[in-house]
Amino acid sequence: MAAVAAEARVFLEVRRRLQSALLILGDSKEGGLPMAVSVTPSSLRMQSPGGCTELRLPAGVRLAPSTCRGLQHVPGDGLHLRLHARAESRPELISVFNQSSQDQECCTFYCQSCGEVIIRDRMLLRVLPLPGDNWGALVDEWCCHPDPFANKPLHPRENDCFTGDCFYLVNLKSDLWQPRPEGAPVETHHLSSENHLKLKPKANTKVICKRCKVMLGETVSSETTKFYMTEIIILPSERNFPIIPRSQFVQSVLAQCVVELSSARSTFRFTIQGHDDKVYILLWLLNSDSLVIESLGQYTNIKKFPVLEDVLKPDSNSACNAVKVLYQPCIKSRNAELSSLWENDLSVHSLTLPSTTCLELLLILSKSNATLPPSLRCMNSFQVAFLKM
């Protein structure tokens, strides 16, 4: 995708399932100027006295110019119009553990922030998902015998890795070097198979990267450690550590997580809480089939944050698969009443991440919201954002 000039701001959201697109053309100058707009199946061209902007669409994306409808000018945004569009299917989400390619391979666990090796050359013979929240209810409903695993923890063996919603459970008994917790040995008590174990809050169980001091996870027993998916990269040992911008990695992990949960459990609302049990964000998945294409032009009202160095900069173009979410921040007692309602709602799923990652995610969502055209930033009482896949 290339731009001849970057005078106009262009925003295009293509919905694959609906085969429709919302196109917003805005001029960077207050008050607007006369503009000639040309839409072809593979490009957009905006000609104004101030210059010309041409946006070529990615391969696989096609517009239907004859279907343009709903043309209107929205103050602060520019021209809005809708039209039919087609986009190639989004690549299927691939789990970190692709059983066909990584089975029986040695894997290395890295700290995503700095690349420090956490576990080297671990042969994972079994990668198993932990039972879902409704596992106990299903056993009681459908089985003629009591649940044999009730009130028992599920701990991985030496060459096992158990996967939760947003964490891994790994047995570190045989590792010569283990990431050590900050405090005393952990004590656990067991509730049910839905919550395979709970940590007593009085014990400090954080596992810290010895190089960058980032929290990677928590110890759950003398042999088992929980690593958060947002902090760890797992690769076949023969592959080199990839440098992935932090915000890009956090977005992709969380986006994949909520899409998989919504598909498996018909869950669309999530509370994002820290390891300190505080709720930081209320997240509502709106759709997961968006392709977002934008050229920011001279959009200069974007503050820069070090953690977001890879997010769109002025005079840049971007095309990405994304999930569209609604969110509400809950820090500093904001939205406390709504947060309490969600926490007590059985249809809302809770995701736990390190508290610093929750704050990073909130910053990412706020940044995404700030780059949207003003008319798209709010829906009802929620703020709107896109998480890149």
Swiss-Prot record:
It catalyses: S-ubiquitinyl-[E2 ubiquitin-conjugating enzyme]-L-cysteine + [acceptor protein]-L-lysine = [E2 ubiquitin-conjugating enzyme]-L-cysteine + N(6)-ubiquitinyl-[acceptor protein]-L-lysine. Keywords: Acetylation, Cytoplasm, Metal-binding, Transferase, Ubl conjugation, Ubl conjugation pathway, Zinc. Residues 235-257 are annotated as: Interaction with UBE2C. A motif (BRAT1-like motif) lies at residues 129-159. Residues 353-389 are annotated as: HECT-like. Its main location: cytoplasm. Its EC number is 2.3.2.26. Ubiquitinated by UBCH10 (E2 ubiquitin-conjugating enzyme). It is an enzyme of class 2 (transferase). The modification N-acetylalanine is found at residue 2. Pathway: Protein modification; protein ubiquitination. GO terms for biological process: proteasome-mediated ubiquitin-dependent protein catabolic process; protein autoubiquitination; protein monoubiquitination; protein polyubiquitination. GO terms for cellular component: cytosol; nucleus; ubiquitin ligase complex. One of its GO terms (molecular function) is ubiquitin conjugating enzyme binding. Pfam families: HECT_2 (PF09814). It is found in: Cytoplasm. Zn(2+) binds at residue 144. The keyword Nucleotide-binding does not apply. The C-terminal half (AA 188-389) is able to bind cyclin-B and shows a self-ubiquitination activity (mono-, poly, or multi-ubiquitination) in a HECT-like sequence dependent manner. PANTHER family: E3 UBIQUITIN-PROTEIN LIGASE E3D (PTHR31531:SF2), E3 UBIQUITIN-PROTEIN LIGASE E3D FAMILY MEMBER (PTHR31531). E3 ubiquitin-protein ligase which accepts ubiquitin from specific E2 ubiquitin-conjugating enzymes, and transfers it to substrates, generally promoting their degradation by the proteasome. Independently of its E3 ubiquitin-protein ligase activity, acts as an inhibitor of CPSF3 endonuclease activity by blocking CPSF3 active site. Interacts with UBE2C/UbcH10 (E2 ubiquitin-conjugating enzyme). In vitro, interacts with cyclin-B. This is E3 ubiquitin-protein ligase E3D. It comes from Bos taurus (Bovine). The gene is UBE3D.
